[in-house]
């Protein structure tokens, strides 16, 4: 099996990241279905409703993605980052005000931009861990985007 050239990997990685977060390219999402396109139409009240009564709120889903991006950046720079409290967000993010909801979305945007910059300036994709981390950002975010979009179907029905 031949290896892929890093520029091909990078081109596809950035296209998938862009589609997942911002602009549809036709890889896997329908029009107007990226994460930020989805979030722009969610109110703080909607973001505060736990779907199914015991499940996470949309605000917690978004805060978790922002937290994940922050942690991934730290891990990419140092494979031994401090221990993360992965359950903290699910336990603490519930009802949000419009200002808090906007702040969570801004945090997500900031962390996403930091990940983009990190990936763009990475000197070489020389390890499977680095490639795995990059792919995990797309996959993990796509999973939560699906959770958010499914929750919206329930909340708005």
Q: Model regions: which residues?
A:
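Acidic/histidine-rich alpha-helical segments that form the ligand environment
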Residues: 91-125, 132-137, 141
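Short, contiguous alpha-helical
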Residues: 3-39, 45-89, 125-157
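N-terminal capping/interface segment
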Residues: 1-2, 105
